[in-house]
Regions:
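Conserved serine/cysteine hydrolase catalytic core
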Residues: 184-225
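Active-site loop/oxyanion-hole signature of alpha/beta-hydrolase fold enzymes
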Residues: 38, 47-91, 252
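Catalytic histidine-centered segment of alpha/beta-hydrolase-like enzymes
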Residues: 238-251
C-alpha cells in the first residue's frame, strides 16, 4: 500500500459493502460527517478524508505551494489509492462538491455515483465578484475575518447557526498561509465552475440542497434541469449545509439514491 498524501479515516463495516468516500467543505474536517457515520455505515464502508491543511492535516507540510482544482482532485484520488479502493461512490459537501465533480471528471470509470450536498455548480454575478476579489478582501480584513464573513453571508438565518458555528470553529485550525492558499484558489472559481456546468457525464448524481440556500439553490436547479442522470432534492426550511442542519433528511435522501444506484449496478452485473 502506498503512503497517503492526506490523512483519512477508513471504516470497513462489511466486506460485501460498497465504498463511499466523503469530502468535506472549506474550513471543515472529517468531523463534519459525524451525523452521517451511523446511517451510512449501516449500508456502506466509509472513507472520510481530511482536505489539505484541514483536520488531521493541519500544520503539516502543504501538498503543493499553489493549489489547483486538478491538483487537489489528483491528491484525493491518490488518497483513495493509498486506502486500497477501486470503484467508489463520492459524497461532497459545499466546496467538497466541486472537488467531487473534479474527481469524477478525472476518473469517471472509478466513480459509481456522486452525492453533492450544498452543491456549488455556478456563481451568481454577486458571488462572481466576491470570488474574484476574495484574496484582496481577505488581505484587507484578515483571513479569519473573511471566513467569518463568508459564513454569515452563506448562512444568515437563525436556524443556520449550528452550521455557521461548525464552519467558524473548524476553520480555526487553518494557519494563515493555509487560508491564503485556499483563498487564492477562489479567484479562478467562476471559469472552473462554468466548465463543470457545461460538462456532460453519464455518472449518476444527486444534489441535496436547502430550500433557504439563497446563494446556490437556483443554480443547482438549473444544473439538474440541464443534465440527464441528475436528481435534485430540496430540504424545506433549511440552509446551505443540509447534512448538519437537517441530517435525517440528507441521510435518508442520499441513501435512497445510493440504494437505487447499487441496485442498478447489480442488475447490470447479473445480466
Amino acid at each position: 500500500m502506498t503512503r497517503s498524501p492526506l490523512s483519512f479515516e477508513k471504516i470497513e463495516n462489511n466486506a460485501s459493502f460498497e465504498w463511499a468516500v466523503f469530502v468535506h467543505g472549506a474550513g471543515g474536517s472529517t468531523r463534519t460527517w459525524r451525523r452521517q457515520r451511523e446511517d451510512f455505515g449501516a449500508q456502506y464502508n466509509l472513507l472520510l478524508i481530511d482536505l489539505p491543511d484541514h483536520g488531521a492535516n493541519a500544520g503539516k507540510a502543504a501538498v503543493s505551494e499553489e493549489y489547483t482544482w486538478d491538483g487537489l482532485a489528483d491528491t484525493l484520488w491518490a488518497t483513495v489509492d493509498a486506502a486500497g479502493l477501486k470503484q467508489v461512490h463520492l459524497v461532497g459537501l459545499s466546496l467538497g462538491s466541486i472537488l467531487v465533480m473534479d474527481m469524477e471528471r478525472m476518473q469517471p470509470s472509478r466513480t459509481l455515483s456522486m452525492v453533492l450536498g450544498g452543491a456549488i455548480v455556478k456563481l451568481t454575478p454577486q458571488l462572481r465578484f466576491i470570488a474574484n476579489t476574495s484574496l484582496a478582501l481577505a488581505k484587507l480584513i484578515g483571513f479569519r475575518s473573511f471566513y467569518k464573513l463568508a459564513a454569515r453571508i452563506a448562512l444568515p438565518r437563525k436556524n443556520h447557526k449550528k452550521s455557521r458555528d461548525v464552519f467558524v470553529r473548524e476553520s480555526q485550525a487553518l494557519s494563515i498561509p493555509a487560508f491564503k492558499r485556499w483563498t487564492e484558489l477562489y479567484t479562478g472559481l467562476d471559469d472552473h465552475l462554468n466548465m463543470l456546468f457545461m460538462r456532460t457525464t453519464t455518472t449518476p448524481r444527486l444534489l441535496v440542497m436547502g430550500g433557504q440556500d439563497h446563494l446556490f439553490g437556483k443554480q443547482a436547479a438549473l444544473y439538474a434541469k440541464r443534465h440527464r442522470h441528475t436528481e435534485l432534492d430540496v430540504a424545506p426550511g433549511c440552509g446551505h449545509v443540509v447534512s448538519i442542519e437537517q441530517p435525517q433528511f440528507f441521510n435518508a435522501t442520499a441513501l435512497a439514491f445510493l440504494k437505487r444506484i447499487t441496485r442498478s449496478i447489480l442488475q447490470v452485473e447479473a445480466a
